[in-house]
């Protein structure tokens, strides 16, 4: 029976006889003495087999190879001074193997090296196909255990400190598409009808508040059939919370304490409370996005009022057509950013184009304080306009000013992308810095140009600000997002709990009373039976752990992720199904493979 994990052994264990299980990380023969690095999920320890001191284990030790599974019993001893290894926690001790038992070998060539000593970069498709090997590697084992520690801290705080209870909500539910596409499943028992996998437990957790379970949480699986990016998966995990009888301030305060507890427990970091706050309008004005990375400055400057009478037609027309003109000031930008990079074909021009911009204007501040730019801009700005630009941006000799002009959405998107790209290039981002902030006072709705209608910016169950009930179309939402180093890691709101307000919101987003009743009648009826004021939040667990682990993709903190084509390379899912199954489900496929 196992007595210890490999990575647990320290000097205090010297003299003990231990039994370990694990994989041979690597084997070395030094002058007839066999050294094995034995690995399990906790780490590595060195095992020694000497023909003189441990003759019973020597022959088998000599035959072992990488990734063989073994049981080893032996005595913990002090390593000689010359072989101490300060790079690993067990580097002061080693095990003299009295007994080795081979539990299983390796019958095929490894597709990649698993050993912690190997620094080879392995293709991601191989890592995902042979995930069981990838998860043995130190980096992945640490990430999965870190994920467990985060979840454990969440549960401990919510249950032991705040009195929340964990409630499971259904995975098979009805389709209420408002946003991303649902994953749908045919019902065999009810032919012609369909279940949907939940995009979130939103409606069920609100029903739980109606039920009197006033502090709910769940580690919830969610499903969205959407285009995938580096930080998205078709199935993902949330910490989902809902609470009754709490104001927006009280919900935010509770969540700051929760997040602070997680950081202290998992990372050993004390976070200053309360977290800073930005309104949505401030975030968009200063950073061009609603999830700004505030580890570095590079704030945008709005000069629309200065440019409305500009002689430069591009700037003047942008303001006249209801758009904006903004500047991204870059200290020392003259030295590092050439005109070639800003003009068509350059990397910064390309970055701007991908955000929808048609061009990229600039002004350079020379060492003598004069400005340098293309003639069309320089000749069409008055001296007063030039001085106002320099004053507002705080530009000094060496500054580069990049302009965005046009509709607000495109300008903000363009300058946000450029801000992030330049911060990385200039080394302005401290990877060890932790900046958390709340973004509050979101608009209730945004305009969907494709469908020519308003849609909820968060979701249609978000409560409007009580001061804005007279005009829902321009109302602020009682919504709040938690931003961690430029990533939204949590989003929540106070909820609508009165039927008439909910019906007004449905009408505003274009749902007829009949559609609202068909999709959400059960919720509207629940509001007739004494619904308490309530609100909540959901945290993206995958994204939060990714940031804790210092990874760049959530695929590296999920045990069995999908690819960006929504495929599982390990099991080769999704796959076809037997025709008999389709008949039982009364389903036929119209898909015709391309020849």
Swiss-Prot record:
Where exactly is the site Important for tRNA non-discrimination?
Answer: 30
Instruction: Name where it mostly resides.
Output: cytoplasm
CDD domains from the xrefs? AspRS_core, EcAspRS_like_N
Instruction: Report the Pfam families cross-referenced here.
Output: GAD (PF02938), tRNA-synt_2 (PF00152), tRNA_anti-codon (PF01336)
Q: Where in the cell is it found?
A: Cytoplasm
Looking at the record, which segments are called Aspartate?
Answer: 202-205
Residues bound to L-aspartate are 178, 224, 458, 495
> Which superkingdom heads the taxonomic lineage of this protein's source?
Bacteria
**Record SUPFAM superfamilies:** Class II aaRS and biotin synthetases (SSF55681), GAD domain-like (SSF55261), Nucleic acid-binding proteins (SSF50249)
One biological process term from GO is:
aspartyl-tRNA aminoacylation
* Root EC class: ligase
Q: Determine if Nucleus is one of this entry's keywords.
A: no
Q: Which NCBIfam families does the record cross-reference, listed alphabetically?
A: aspS_bact (TIGR00459), PRK00476.1 (NF001750)
Function per UniProt = Aspartyl-tRNA synthetase with relaxed tRNA specificity since it is able to aspartylate not only its cognate tRNA(Asp) but also tRNA(Asn). Reaction proceeds in two steps: L-aspartate is first activated by ATP to form Asp-AMP and then transferred to the acceptor end of tRNA(Asp/Asn).
Q: Which HAMAP family match?
A: Asp_tRNA_synth_type1
Describe the family membership recorded for this protein in Swiss-Prot or TrEMBL.
Belongs to the class-II aminoacyl-tRNA synthetase family. Type 1 subfamily.
Subunit structure and binding partners? Homodimer.
The protein's name: Aspartate--tRNA(Asp/Asn) ligase
- Identify the taxonomic lineage of the organism of origin: Bacteria, Bacillati, Cyanobacteriota, Cyanophyceae, Nostocales
- What gene makes this protein? aspS
